[in-house]
Swiss-Prot record:
Keywords: ATP synthesis, CF(0), Chloroplast, Hydrogen ion transport, Ion transport, Membrane, Plastid, Thylakoid, Transmembrane, Transmembrane helix, Transport. Belongs to the ATPase B chain family. It comes from Heterosigma akashiwo (strain NIES-293 / 8280G21-1). This is ATP synthase subunit b, chloroplastic. The chain crosses the membrane at residues 29-47.
Amino acid sequence: MENLTNIFLFLSNENEGIQLNTDIFEANIINLALLIVLVINVAKDVLGSILSARKASILDKIEEADKKLNEADKRFTEARLQWSQANIFGEDLEKKTYQRINAFHESQNLKNKDALLREYFSTLVVLDLKNEQVQKQVRNYVMELALIEVYGVFTKLVANKKFQENYSNYSVLLLEKLIGEK
């Protein structure tokens, strides 16, 4: 330790003391300032291009999800059309059953009338069950498509290292901006 102190005293006496170098060219201050400005400009361009690429990717995913939604909507419309056709068939069947009931009521006895009423109500129950089944299938299909899409997007985002790095960098930049405003 004593040797280190002696070396320091020797150097300070030889150079007439310790002084601040005010020559900006010799101290490399201009070079450092230019390097800092260059790094800031390059980082801004790179970050801008990364963010614009991410934005384009997100817009593509939104368009893809919109297409899938339109497809699910189309299938839902088809199912609704089938449901309305089943209702028309049911109404037609209902009219025919009423006609049969009236014809048998006039010509047949009470037993035949009871059998037709049971057939009518069982037909209504079957139609209601089919209607509920179709609606349930459509709801399940739409929910399945939505869950598959959400799971896929979420999995890709979580697995993407660049997204995680960009999100971390973006959070740091926002925090620095927030601290700088106070």
